[in-house]
Amino acid sequence: MDKGQTLSQTSGRVTFKELKAIIKMGLVQGNLIPAFAGSWLAIVLANHSFLSSIPQILLMLIGSTLIMGGACALNNYYDQDIDRIMPSKQARPTVNDRISNKNLLILSFGMMVIGEIALFILNIPSGVIGLMGIIGYVSFYSIWSKRHTTWNTVIGAFPGAVPPVIGWTAIEGQLSMTAIALFLVIFCWQPIHFYALAIKRQDEYSAANIPMLPSVKGFNRTRIGMFVWLILLLPLPFLLSDLGPVFIGLATLLNLGWIYLGLTSYKKKSDHMKWATLMFVYSLNYLVLFFALVVIISLINMI
């Protein structure tokens, strides 16, 4: 049976659960939080009506979901060779031949094209930023840097930080220092998050010959790098001074709490996996709490 002529190599069509794995729905959903926060902050700071802005928000969320999901599907297509080596990737439909390459590419490019149309309907800046995110993630991260340099995580952080900027421009139609500040928060957050994950999967990345920082430079060098990015996060709440001193204080406490955890939870060499897990879990909570603060504090200020 020709793989290019059927939806899957095994019996039955791709399930919704498998579709979510193909487009990395968990990653997409996580990025929709800062995307919405960007739109919400633009509405509040520019005194727009929330009700009249709902169509823009919905179109932005749909467009963002489609371009991110499409780019992730294309990443899965390109990474099939290394995913087959890594134990944590064995459930992916692209690894166990649940979807053909032809249909995977149709799904990927179809989602990205429709998503870009949605963003360009909103305005040109949103569409352009979305396109830059696609090109950055697929070309500069997936195809080039992921397999060739330990700077891959930092390079991938550029396209990974565009969701709140798209959210902002969907409402305002132009960039601002506030949008750039949101970008910088996500940009600095990503290396800490993904280095922690890379420590946990160090052996897998080494086996697949992917030059993640822990696999090439070791744990101590990676830990130092994570603290550098934690320090860079510290001043960023002050760039969002429009949200007031309460937000700055609470966001700074979030940052200091992360630094404290990093300093106190590592006792001995054998603890590095436990330490990485704690840092990874904190990173997930940090993302939600930070942007929840953005929304809640701005709502309180508006009242």
Swiss-Prot record:
InterPro entries: Protohaem_IX_farnesylTrfase, UbiA_prenyltransferase, UbiA_sf
Transmembrane intervals: 25-45, 54-74, 104-124, 125-145, 151-171, 179-199, 228-248, 280-300
Protein topology in the membrane: Multi-pass membrane protein
Gene3D superfamilies (UniProt xref): UbiA prenyltransferase
Localization in the cell: Cell membrane
EC number from the UniProt entry: 2.5.1.141
GO terms, molecular function: protoheme IX farnesyltransferase activity
Pathway(s) this gene product operates in, as recorded in its UniProt entry: Porphyrin-containing compound metabolism; heme O biosynthesis; heme O from protoheme: step 1/1
Keyword Membrane appears in the UniProt entry: yes
GO biological process: heme O biosynthetic process
GO CC terms in record: plasma membrane
Alphabetic keyword roster: Cell membrane, Heme biosynthesis, Membrane, Transferase, Transmembrane, Transmembrane helix
Role, per record: Converts heme B (protoheme IX) to heme O by substitution of the vinyl group on carbon 2 of heme B porphyrin ring with a hydroxyethyl farnesyl side group.
Family that this chain belongs to: Belongs to the UbiA prenyltransferase family. Protoheme IX farnesyltransferase subfamily.
Subunit structure: Interacts with CtaA.
Misc note: Carbon 2 of the heme B porphyrin ring is defined according to the Fischer nomenclature.
UniProt protein name: Protoheme IX farnesyltransferase
Natural source organism: Staphylococcus carnosus (strain TM300)
